[in-house]
Every structure is written in structure tokens, then in C-alpha cells.
């Protein structure tokens, strides 16, 4: 096979920015088969597989890419499926540039192989062309419970189902999917794709119980007692938003990004007939610089805002969001106001947001995170005229589970404490992973945690 020594990735086709910023259709259109084969031929098949070491779920990346280069897309899918339960999701939202692609040998002198785009292509090809029913293993006589139907919980459920366990997933919301459904907008991750992944788990025998708030409707003790589950995995995520505690944060028109995106993505609160309407406004400020901030800003634009600002206390180089998401936001007309920070939000005569006072910042010495610490510039305050403010400052786990589970150790941030990488908690038979343990992190890291915990749960039950 002839290698493709093009120094750059095959570009991803996308919707025109001036069209897509008015609709919720997926921005990235995906590779054609010809594009995928050509891009796969850029892989030089390193024997030591550095890219695989950057994948939290350990996909054999050179092997699946070699199959793509040969045009055997189903074989490529089977390689991915050995390690990942959600390839169509990961191919779209994982930060490959800091994981698998960040370790790619081609990336030392040129652009790395577009591993994420190839994973997405393979998953989409399989979904559109292969319609065989999954193999359902024989029941091994044991049953387990999963709390939370997000990426960690879905991964743990899938891996345990493959081992023959009777798996029940308890989800607090009315639909399964967790952050994949409520947090990531349609234009970045179509909900039909997430639903198809969930349907695949159902075909394997996984049961889903929605509208079940564990810690309120049922407790972990009840699940392991009268319900008879031999082990429980807690993958309940981190849905409790953080705020700045500045004057005016309780005004009408101030939202957490979590609330704004949940109501937009799941509850269609932007419709005039909604019982829980969301006020988008014409001039929107999103405070924060991560992927969630980009999602909120780009959603607000699509919901009719005329001007949308990203207000971030560090510079463009320090933005934690994926480079691709920042580029897409800029292309769509999002205005970046960096090196500034809100200090107060002001109301109009009816109690709605009217403006926001910000102060200019400069970067000092690195802080504990390794990034340069933002410092206020005295006397540099200025007014930003806005009518909606969305706070995207991170999230922490909901305290409900820890407050109703005696003996479950948590840290000062409310995250569940686990032992090593297995997800073992201070309670026998209780495992945890994903954002409930780490705080807000990436989809693929949550999946890696779910995968490791599933293996540990299997060993625990077999050795009882």
C-alpha cells in the first residue's frame, strides 16, 4: 500500500458559517469514503503505537486505520467496537488534539493523522450500512446497577452486558444520555446518533429506568439490599453549576450554561409555547472559555441573538476549549472579549439584565493549574451592554448521592473518592467514575473510567 505523505489532514467539509449560525444542523459534514481512505493512508503504522497510549479507552488505532486504508470499513468498526461503546460520539466530541492525535508521530513535523474524523467516518458507515442484531451473551446469573446514563454509565453498562450481567441503568432525567443529550448541542452532536448508541445497548438487554433520582426515589443501600444488585456503579456526573458570587447574578436573564443548554437541548424552552421559557435576548454574554461556553454562545446565536460575546479572563492562547470549537465560533461571528472579567451585573427597571461591568485583566505568574494567573488592572472597569448573561464556570457533583449514602467518602469538592484507576469507593461493591469523581472533564475520560470500573466490578463479583 502506498502511503499518503501529504503534510496536512484532509479538510473536514462543513456547512457555510453564515448558513449554519442560523440552524441546528450538524456543522461538520463528515468524510466521504474516498477522503477517509486517503487520510488513513497518511498513517505510517508505528510499531509502538504512541497514538493508542493517548486513548483513554485504548482503541487499537493503527489497526483500525489500516483497515480503513484498505477500504474494509466494517473490519475497522469491529476493532473500534472492542474498546469503545460510543465511537460515533467520540469521533465528534473527543479532544483528539490533546489525546491520540497529540501523540501521533506524523504530528511531530506535520499535521497528525485525523484519527477522530476517521473514527467518526467508520462509526457512521457502520450505522448506515450494517443492520445486524448485536450478540446477546447468556445471562451469568448476576445483576448490577448503573446510576447515571451519561458516557461513564453507558460505557460501564455496555461492557458489563457483554460479560453476561443483567444491567439496569437509573437516570434522573426523562431521557438517557446524560451530558451527551442535555449538554452538547445538536449542531455538534446530533441526538439521533446518541439515541442509536443507547438503542444498541437496549438490544443487548440493558434496561433503562428514567426519571429515577437516586438519593431521592431510591438509595444505594436499597439498590444493594431489597433490589438485590451485587454491585453499583455511580456515574451521575457533575451537574451542579458554579457562579462568581458577584452583584446581580440573581437577576432575571442570568443563567448557568448547564441550565441554558439543558432547557434548549432537551426542553425546547425557546419555543413560544414552552411552559418554562428561556429568554435568549439580543445581546448575550457568555462568561467562560471552555467547550461548554462555546456551545452556549453558539446556541444563543442560533436562537436569535444579534451579538454574542465570550468574556474570558485570560487570553485567546489560554482558552481551554478545543481549537476547532473556537475556530467554528469565530467563523460564526462570536465576539471574543478576552483578558477581562465581570465584576457586577445591572438590572433595568423591570429586574432584567441591562448591562455588565467588566474589568480588564493581565497575566501574571503561573498558578496551580500551570496557566498564568489573571490579575485585575485597577481602574480599568468598563460597561458591556447585554440583556442575557450565561455563566459557564464549571460544575461539581450534586450532593444528593453522597448525603444519602453513609460511608461513601468524598473530597472537599464533593467528588467521590476512588482507589486507583478501578473506581473502587470506600463502600464495598460501590464503584464510581466520570465527572462524579473528577469534576467536569471530557466524554472520553468518563468512558475510560466506566470501562475500568466495569472490569473491576466483574472481578469483585466473581471473587465474592
Predicted regions and their residues:
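Ferredoxin-type iron-sulfur electron-transfer modules in oxidoreductases and energy-metabolism complexes
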Residues: 20-39, 59-92, 109-138, 264-265
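Iron-sulfur cluster-binding cysteine motifs and their immediate structural context
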Residues: 45-70, 89-122, 168, 175, ...
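Feature captures the FAD/FMN-dependent oxidoreductase FAD-binding
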Residues: 75, 138, 143-147, 195-246, ...
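Glycine-rich dinucleotide-binding loop and its adjacent helix/turn
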Residues: 121-138, 196-216, 241-303, 411-421, ...
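N-terminal Rossmann-like FAD-binding beta1-loop-alpha1 element of flavoenzymes
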Residues: 142-168, 293-301
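Rossmann-like dinucleotide-binding cores of NAD(P)H-dependent redox enzymes
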Residues: 169, 173-203, 207-208, 297-344
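FAD-site-proximal beta/loop scaffold in flavoenzymes
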Residues: 250-281, 366-440
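A conserved FAD-binding loop/helix module that cradles the flavin
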Residues: 436-462
Amino acid at each position: 500500500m502506498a502511503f499518503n505523505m501529504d503534510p496536512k489532514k484532509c479538510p473536514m467539509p462543513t456547512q457555510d458559517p453564515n448558513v449554519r449560525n442560523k440552524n441546528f444542523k450538524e456543522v461538520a459534514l463528515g468524510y466521504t469514503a474516498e477522503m477517509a481512505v486517503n487520510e488513513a493512508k497518511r498513517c505510517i503504522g508505528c510499531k509502538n503505537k504512541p497514538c493508542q497510549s493517548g486513548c483513554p479507552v485504548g482503541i487499537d488505532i493503527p489497526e483500525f486505520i489500516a483497515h480503513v486504508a484498505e477500504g474494509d470499513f466494517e473490519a475497522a468498526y469491529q476493532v473500534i467496537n472492542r474498546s469503545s461503546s460510543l465511537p460515533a460520539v467520540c469521533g465528534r466530541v473527543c479532544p483528539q488534539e490533546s489525546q491520540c492525535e497529540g501523540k501521533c508521530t506524523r504530528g511531530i513535523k506535520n499535521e497528525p493523522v485525523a484519527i477522530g474524523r476517521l473514527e467518526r467516518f467508520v462509526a457512521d458507515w457502520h450505522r448506515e450500512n450494517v443492520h445486524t442484531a448485536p450478540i446477546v451473551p447468556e445471562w451469568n446469573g448476576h445483576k448490577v446497577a448503573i446510576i447515571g446514563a451519561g458516557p461513564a454509565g453507558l460505557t460501564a453498562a455496555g461492557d458489563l452486558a457483554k460479560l453476561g450481567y443483567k444491567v439496569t441503568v437509573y437516570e434522573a432525567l426523562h431521557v438517557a444520555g446524560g451530558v451527551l443529550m442535555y449538554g452538547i448541542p445538536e449542531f455538534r452532536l446530533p441526538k439521533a446518533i446518541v439515541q442509536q448508541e443507547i438503542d444498541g445497548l437496549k438490544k443487548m438487554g440493558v434496561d433503562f429506568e428514567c426519571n429515577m433520582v437516586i438519593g431521592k426515589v431510591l438509595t444505594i443501600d436499597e439498590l444493594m439490599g431489597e433490589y438485590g444488585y451485587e454491585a453499583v456503579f455511580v456515574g451521575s456526573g457533575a451537574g451542579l453549576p458554579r457562579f462568581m458570587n458577584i452583584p446581580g447574578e440573581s437577576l432575571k436573564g442570568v443563567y448557568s450554561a448547564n441550565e441554558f443548554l439543558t432547557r434548549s437541548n432537551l426542553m425546547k424552552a425557546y419555543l413560544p409555547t414552552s411552559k418554562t421559557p428561556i429568554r435568549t435576548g439580543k445581546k448575550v454574554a457568555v462568561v467562560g472559555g471552555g467547550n461548554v461556553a462555546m456551545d452556549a454562545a453558539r446556541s444563543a446565536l442560533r436562537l436569535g441573538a444579534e451579538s454574542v460575546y465570550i468574556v474570558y479572563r485570560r487570553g485567546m492562547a489560554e482558552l481551554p476549549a478545543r481549537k476547532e470549537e473556537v475556530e467554528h465560533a469565530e467563523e460564526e461571528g462570536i465576539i471574543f472579549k478576552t483578558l477581562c472579567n465581570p465584576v457586577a451585573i445591572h438590572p433595568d427597571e423591570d429586574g432584567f439584565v441591562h448591562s455588565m461591568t467588566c474589568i480588564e485583566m493581565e497575566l501574571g505568574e503561573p498558578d496551580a493549574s500551570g496557566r498564568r494567573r489573571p490579575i485585575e488592572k485597577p481602574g480599568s472597569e468598563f460597561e458591556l451592554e447585554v440583556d442575557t448573561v450565561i455563566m459557564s464556570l464549571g460544575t461539581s457533583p450534586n450532593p444528593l448521592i453522597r448525603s444519602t449514602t453513609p460511608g461513601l467518602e468524598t473530597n472537599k469538592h464533593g467528588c467521590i473518592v476512588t482507589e486507583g484507576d478501578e473506581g473502587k469507593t470506600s463502600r464495598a461493591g460501590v464503584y464510581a467514575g466520570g465527572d462524579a469523581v473528577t469534576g467536569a472533564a471530557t466524554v472520553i475520560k468518563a468512558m475510560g473510567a466506566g470501562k475500568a470500573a466495569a472490569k473491576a466490578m466483574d472481578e469483585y463479583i466473581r471473587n465474592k
